[in-house]
Design a protein with these regions (language model features):
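ABC ATP-binding cassette signature C-motif
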Residues: 1-193
Length: 193
């Protein structure tokens, strides 16, 4: 686990370096290699967000795998009322086993508190109201929403291009504490400490 700061003059290529590490910029000589299974998350200076979505929908993308598990868990539970399942012990056993697998995954992901987790993250970063359409957000508000989504994804390697831009002092303090405790690697370009 490393916390790395990239410093340099304007135009020196700091943002380009992060894009290369993130796999976005392919116009270079050399090779970036990650161990298999590592996830990389990248916050660019001007995040591209789907303008047709709400703030909450964008933030939820950060925990989409957990939301998908919850949806499947609900579908499995609804299947217990299916007459075909009730009459077939093999189908019932398969359903019970799948329910147990999903329950274990959901417990491990603390999925039962996902709404609270989303709300806390959005509050900490002073995100706009959850029902606000992304198309109406300012550049700074879009960055807050994108940062919130990225932090909820919890990637192994976090690439941050000036993450404190457009954040107030309280949000910067929260972010600094969060990054100090972050369990993965953080590579950051910033003009703050």
């Amino acid at each position: 686990v490393a916390k790395i700061g990239i410093i340099g003059l304007n135009g020196a290529g700091k943002s380009t370096l992060l894009k290369i590490i993130a796999g976005i910029d392919k116009q270079y000589q050399g090779e970036v290699v990650f161990s298999p299974g590592y996830s990389v998350g990248y916050l660019e200076q001007d995040p591209k967000l789907d303008p047709s979505k709400t703030v909450k929908e964008i933030v939820q993308e950060g925990v989409q795998p957990v939301l998908d598990l919850l949806k499947e868990f609900d579908q499995v539970n609804e299947s217990f009322a299916d007459p075909d399942v009730l009459e077939d012990p093999d189908k019932m056993d398969k359903l019970i086993n799948r329910q147990a697998e999903l329950q274990d995954k959901l417990d491990a992901a603390d999925a039962w508190n996902i709404d609270n987790k989303l709300e806390r993250a959005m509050d900490a970063l002073r995100c706009p109201p959850e029902d606000q359409n992304v198309a109406t957000l300012s550049g700074g508000e879009r960055r807050r929403v994108a940062l919130c989504r990225l932090l909820l994804q919890n990637p192994d390697i976090l690439l941050l291009d000036e993450p404190t831009n457009h954040l107030d002092a309280e949000s910067i303090d929260w972010l600094e504490q969060h990054l100090q405790q972050y369990p993965g690697t953080v590579i950051c370009i910033t003009h703050d400490r």
